[in-house]
Structures are given as C-alpha cells and as structure tokens.
C-alpha cells in the first residue's frame, strides 16, 4: 500500500468513527430522572439520595408533612397519619390517587419509586402506580424494602401480598430489611435503616447503568 492509499484508508476510517460517534450521541439522549418517595420510608430514601447532589427531580408523597425538606424536594401530602397495625392484612386495596399525583407522570422522565412495604400509603401506592406506569409504557423502576421480622406476622402477610402483585414487573426490586439488620446486628436500629437507604440507592444505580444507553450516567451517579 503506497502513501496515497494509506491516507485514503485513514480518512475513511476517521469518517466511519465520526459517524459511529454521531449515531451514538443521537441515540443516547440524556436520561431525565425523577426520584419519588412513597410513604415515610420511601421519603427517607429520597432525602438520602438528595444529599448525593444528583441532578434529578425529587418528590416525596407521604404523611405527615416534612417541613424540614430542602426547597428542591417537592412534597405532596397523602395518606393518614394514623396507621392501625391490627388491620394491615385487610389493607390491600386501591387508594384514590389525586390529580396532583397523577400529573407527576405526564413527562417523559425515568421514574424511580422508592418505598418501604408495610405502611398503608407506600405499599398500596407503589402497587397502583407501577401498574399505571406499565400500562402507559412509561420508563420506571420500583424499589421497595420488606419489613423486619419483629414487626409481626400480620404486617408480614400484608407485605407478602403486595410483593406478589409486584413480582409481575421485571423492573421491581426488593430489599429484605431483616438481612440488613443481621448484617449490622451490632449497630443501633437507626443505623440499619440508614444502611437500607444506601442499599436502595445502590440497587437503583446498578440496574440503571445496565439498562440505560446514556454514557454520562456512570459519572453523574456517585458510588
């Protein structure tokens, strides 16, 4: 191959690489993430993730109000402040979802739902909203925790029913709080909850990096 042929070959290769990079740029639109915490436990996860400084939209949906929330975390009051633990097994039912909540999902964002199964608000909302998002072909992920063993058999039965409803979604993932408690059994209970919040984030991060074609995510989602 003479010098002229070599230059033509290099020019063609450079053009091909440019076109491939251009196609990758066009096809890999930046992912707009909307983190949504459902119920008290889910809202705690949102506060934990917010501290990481990730460029995203944040919303907490729970009761009671959280006046300490930073201004860029939206809050929607939903549910009752009183939970009757004796009737958890009877609480698998559809809740009335307000227009304010439904309007959150009108955008083309990637929605990430966090909750702790066991509470009436978070458990039922997660189940209902996941079904709604799936039906509307929205991109979403649901991450929820299963309760500690000491929280009682009725609460455990309630959450198992909800988990069965979520098992049909491939993008729903659960974390067992009892496993985390055993791992950090020498720590105080609040430490186990903090570790659970981080486990929820890491589970989201691992799955979104596998799913998304946005190459910038690996830099924008801290470890």
Indicate where each model-derived feature is located.
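Tubulin/FtsZ superfamily GTPase core signature
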Residues: 10-13, 19-223
